[in-house]
Each structure stands twice: as structure tokens, then as C-alpha cells.
């Protein structure tokens, strides 16, 4: 019997053990070749059709559930006007930080005409550039609560106060109250003693009631301020509280705070100067922004306020895109109307969280179809069901991320980051579609190109995940969760490992995994978006770890001596 050099060097028991393993492997292959195939493998065309049907239904259901209209009781009848709404005169392409800032009188005129159909008054926050607003308010039959913006620069505050006094005295029939300062103590820009002096000065020079506006916690910290105002203006924003209230408990929280103020300041008139709910943005604990939740909160609050005879001002009239830079995406979406002055159906009528859902569904279906065409015929019978479903998941994630990016992106850097993640998902979708396809001709060449760079797509996903995880751990307040952007790459490279450089993959996996528990502690377990992100981060860390292991296996195989 001929014995190979390798067999000659091995002990007899080792050769026997190796031959036994070979025999077991051959037997397993024989059994698999003769075992009855599952029905879907015997009929790959049927499995493919089933996959197409399931994927189509899944895509349609995803976007329908996002955008279906919800019917809620209206805030008031069409002829019943509400009390007051906050108004800032900025268009969707304007910001108070633009200097020199130029107001658009025609836009302000149209804005007040629109607000006059639903409200009896508007509240403003600054006098700079708004000297003409009392005349416009008179034109449209609106009353004003005029505000002077007080900050840390005494000269700026002095100009604001002088203009406020002049406008209040020039338009006593329009200006029903004045507010000196807005959350100035919260921003720690002035002292309560300084505010007392300003309030006393304004009270001595105008006939209207004078107030100061602050979040409710700071009124309780500085109760002495109540002695210097004619009425208390408190801000009740359950979303922004240090302990946010979910939509189910928000109104109970508001009513409780309002009762506490009646007890803390007996006999003092109270205006709820700001209350509302955001329609877009990141979840804070159990407080979830959405159009439906905004409509639900506003409508229920108005009924509650009318029942109790509360004075109130809703925040705010129009969405303010410029606020996204300083308050995150959520800051720009407190309006009753959007930045284009279109009704969001917050006050009346059916309301949808995603009114454009048919457009996003069409985009997802088109991308899904393109992925199937790119992949071509499934490579194996078992892929016939998987290919349409996997492509649908990728198309849905791209669509959901696109819809989210449209909401959270305002500035160039944000759009570039969003585009980076869209491109990454498209590359991963192309990679998977081709890998599940038969792969002949140009498809085989393209798959080979993508396959050799699969580790880079994995590292690009890990880089995005690590950056976002660090942001959510160390600067989370205004950060959105990138769930739709990273779910697909994480799943693909967890199930189908890509060889990634050991050092980089290990570092990224460590950063992502190490941040999971801290961000959950910060967000608490009631935050569904945070829980989903933690799951995706775990998948992504696992994908990076598998990529690292794959690289070790490849390196070991390359260094092993030939038999």
C-alpha cells in the first residue's frame, strides 16, 4: 500500500482518526445528496414567487403603518378660535443668526392672516425687526402678547426694553400684555435681581400687565420673582422636562403642575406661556415625537384648558428649521403648521405621521426591483425565497433612512453624513443581491469587486456605528438614533461575514459594544428607539467580531504549509 509522506510522518492513531473524519464527511455528503429536499427547494420558482409576494406585502405594510391617517376629536369647532400661539417671523430659509437679518413684511402679513383664522392672539419673543407687527395684528384683528428678549449683553436688553415700552404705549388696543425676558434664568444669562429691576421699570412705564416667562421649575426656584409681575408665565413642556412624560401621562403631569402653582402662588394670575409637543425628532425616555402625538396632546390640552378656564399659549405657530442647529431635529418641529405654512392637521382632521408615505413606498419598491434585477436568477434553490426578502429589507431601510434624513438634515454636513449612509446601504444591498444571484458574466465581475471590498463596507458601517454610539453616550440630548441606517449592514455582515482588518474591526467593535449599556442607562428602558439602537449596535459589534475572526482564519490558512 502506498503511504503519503504526510501519513508516514503521522502516528498510526492520528492517521486512523483523520481517515475516520473523512469517512464521516463523505457519509454526511451522501446522506445530504439522497435526503428529500424541502418543498421550496424542489420548486424554486414557487419559492421565488412566494418571496416576491411576502416582500411586496411587507413593504406595503411598513409604509402604510407609517402613514395611515388617525382620526382624533378636533381641538375645537371651525368657528371657535383658540387663545394664543407663539409666533416667530422666520421663513424656512431664515434664521435670527443671519446678519444682517431682513424681515419679509409680505410673509408676516400672510402669516398673521392665517393665524387669525384659528387664534385670537399671538405671542412674540423679541422686538428686533418686529416694530411693524402691532399694525399687522390690528389689521387682522389679533391681540398681541409682546416680548422683549433679554440676554447677557446689557446694551441688547436695553434696546429691547425701549422698543417694547414704545410699542405697548403706541398700540394699547392691540398689545394686551408684555413679557420681559424668556427663560433667561434657565440660560443663566442674568440674575433674578437684574430681572427685578427691568420688570419694575417696564411696569412703571406701560399700562398693560407685565410678566416674565420661565420653565416651571425655575419659578419654584425663584418664587420672589412673582412679586414683581402682574401674572406668572410658566412653560409646561412635558417632552423637555428633566423627567420627560410620555404622551399617555403628559396631560396629567401638566394638570398637576398647574395645581401646584395655584397653591404656591395663591391669588396670582397664571398664563401657561408655552405648551406643546414635537412632531419629529428623537425619543426622550417615554416621550415620543410624532405628528399623531402632537395632535393628540394639543387637542386634549385645549379641551382641558377650556374646562378649567386656564389661559394658555400654544408653541408654536410654524415649524422653525433654524432651531435644528441648536436643539437638534426635534427643535424645528413644534409648529401647528409646517415651515411651508401648510396645515399639519394638529388642530383638526385626520392626522398622519408620514403624509408622503405613498411616495416613499414607490421609492422602496423601485429600489427593491432594481436590486432583484441586479442580482438576477438566484444562485441556489434555497436562495429563491431569501433573495426577494433580503432585497426588500434593504430597500425599506434605505427608504426609512431617507425619510428620517429629510427631517433631521438642514445643513451641508448633515446632508453629507446622510448621503454617506445611503451610499453605504446601497453598496451592501448590491453586494448581497449579487451574492445571492447566479453570478455569471458582468455580475460575476461586479460581485468579485464588491467581495474583495466587503471588509471595507463592514468597517464603514462600524465607523458610523462607533461615531453615533459615542455621540449618544457623551452628547445625547439632541442626537437622533440611526436605526434605519445601520440595521441592514449589521444584519448582512453578521450573517455573511466579511474579512475585515483585525485591529480596526476590533477597535470599532469594542467602542460600539462598550457604549450599549451606558446609553441604555442614560435613556432608560422606556425608550423604544434606544432599545432598538442597542439591539442594532449589538448586531453590528457581532458583525465586526465575525469579520475579525474571518480575517484570522484567512491569515491562518494563508500561512499554513501546503500538504
Predicted regions and their residues:
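Aromatic-lined carbohydrate-recognition surfaces of secreted/lumenal glycan-active proteins
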Residues: 206-220, 268-273, 311-319
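Substrate-binding cleft of secreted/luminal carbohydrate-active enzymes
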Residues: 288-347
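Substrate-binding cleft of extracellular glycoside hydrolase catalytic domains
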Residues: 127, 133-209
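Active-site clefts of carbohydrate-active enzymes
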Residues: 237-244, 266-294
Amino acid at each position: 500500500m502506498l503511504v503519503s509522506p504526510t501519513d508516514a510522518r503521522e502516528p498510526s492513531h492520528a492517521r486512523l482518526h483523520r481517515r475516520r473524519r473523512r469517512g464521516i464527511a463523505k457519509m454526511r455528503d451522501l446522506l445530504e445528496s439522497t435526503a428529500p429536499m424541502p418543498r421550496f427547494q424542489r420548486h424554486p420558482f414557487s419559492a421565488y414567487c412566494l418571496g416576491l409576494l411576502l416582500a411586496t406585502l411587507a413593504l406595503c405594510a411598513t409604509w402604510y403603518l407609517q402613514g395611515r391617517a388617525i382620526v382624533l376629536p378636533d381641538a375645537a369647532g371651525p368657528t371657535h378660535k383658540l387663545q394664543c400661539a407663539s409666533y416667530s417671523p422666520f421663513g424656512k430659509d431664515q434664521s435670527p443668526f443671519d446678519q444682517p437679518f431682513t424681515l419679509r413684511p409680505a410673509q408676516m402679513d400672510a402669516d398673521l392672516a392665517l393665524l387669525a383664522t384659528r387664534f385670537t392672539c399671538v405671542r412674540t419673543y423679541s422686538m428686533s425687526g418686529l416694530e411693524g407687527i402691532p399694525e399687522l395684528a390690528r389689521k387682522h384683528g389679533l391681540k398681541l402678547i409682546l416680548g422683549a428678549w433679554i440676554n447677557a449683553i446689557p446694551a441688547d436688553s436695553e434696546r429691547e426694553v425701549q422698543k417694547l415700552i414704545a410699542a405697548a404705549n403706541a398700540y394699547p388696543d392691540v398689545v394686551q400684555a408684555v413679557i420681559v425676558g424668556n427663560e433667561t434664568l434657565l440660560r443663566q444669562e442674568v440674575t433674578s435681581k437684574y430681572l427685578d429691576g427691568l420688570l419694575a421699570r417696564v411696569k412703571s412705564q406701560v399700562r398693560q400687565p407685565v410678566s416674565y416667562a420661565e420653565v416651571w421649575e425655575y419659578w419654584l426656584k425663584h418664587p420672589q420673582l412673582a412679586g414683581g409681575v402682574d401674572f406668572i408665565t410658566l412653560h409646561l413642556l412635558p417632552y423637555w422636562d428633566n423627567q420627560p412624560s410620555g404622551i399617555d401621562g403628559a396631560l396629567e403631569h401638566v394638570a398637576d403642575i398647574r395645581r401646584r402653582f395655584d397653591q404656591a402662588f395663591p391669588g396670582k394670575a397664571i398664563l401657561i406661556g408655552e405648551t406643546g409637543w414635537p412632531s419629529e425628532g428623537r425619543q426622550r425616555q417615554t416621550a415620543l415625537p410624532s405628528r399623531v402625538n402632537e395632535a393628540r396632546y394639543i387637542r386634549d390640552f385645549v379641551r382641558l384648558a377650556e374646562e378649567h378656564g386656564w389661559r394658555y399659549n400654544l408653541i408654536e405657530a410654524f415649524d422653525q428649521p433654524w432651531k435644528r442647529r441648536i436643539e437638534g431635529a426635534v427643535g424645528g418641529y413644534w409648529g401647528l403648521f409646517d415651515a411651508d405654512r401648510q396645515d399639519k392637521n394638529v388642530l383638526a382632521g385626520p392626522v398622519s405621521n408620514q403624509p408622503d408615505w405613498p411616495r416613499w413606498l414607490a421609492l422602496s419598491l423601485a429600489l427593491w426591483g432594481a436590486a432583484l434585477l441586479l442580482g438576477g436568477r438566484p444562485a441556489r434553490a434555497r436562495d429563491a425565497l431569501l433573495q426577494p426578502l433580503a432585497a426588500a429589507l434593504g430597500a425599506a431601510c434605505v427608504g426609512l433612512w431617507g425619510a428620517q434624513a429629510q427631517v433631521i438634515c438642514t445643513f451641508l454636513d448633515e446632508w453629507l453624513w446622510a448621503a454617506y449612509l445611503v451610499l453605504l446601504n446601497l453598496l451592501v444591498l448590491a453586494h448581497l443581491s449579487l451574492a445571492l444571484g447566479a453570478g455569471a458574466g458582468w455580475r460575476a465581475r461586479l460581485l468579485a469587486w464588491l467581495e474583495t471590498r466587503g471588509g471595507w463596507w463592514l468597517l464603514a458601517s462600524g465607523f458610523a456605528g462607533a461615531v453615533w454610539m459615542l455621540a449618544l453616550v457623551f452628547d445625547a440630548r439632541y442626537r437622533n438614533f440611526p436605526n434605519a441606517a445601520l440595521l441592514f449592514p449589521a444584519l448582512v455582515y453578521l450573517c455573511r461575514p466579511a474579512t475585515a482588518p483585525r485591529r480596526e474591526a476590533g477597535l470599532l467593535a469594542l467602542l460600539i459594544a462598550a457604549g450599549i449599556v451606558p446609553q441604555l442607562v442614560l435613556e432608560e428602558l422606556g425608550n423604544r428607539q434606544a432599545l432598538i439602537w442597542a439591539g442594532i449596535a449589538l448586531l453590528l459589534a457581532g458583525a465586526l467580531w465575525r469579520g475579525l475572526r474571518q480575517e484570522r482564519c484567512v491569515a491562518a490558512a494563508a500561512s499554513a504549509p501546503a500538504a
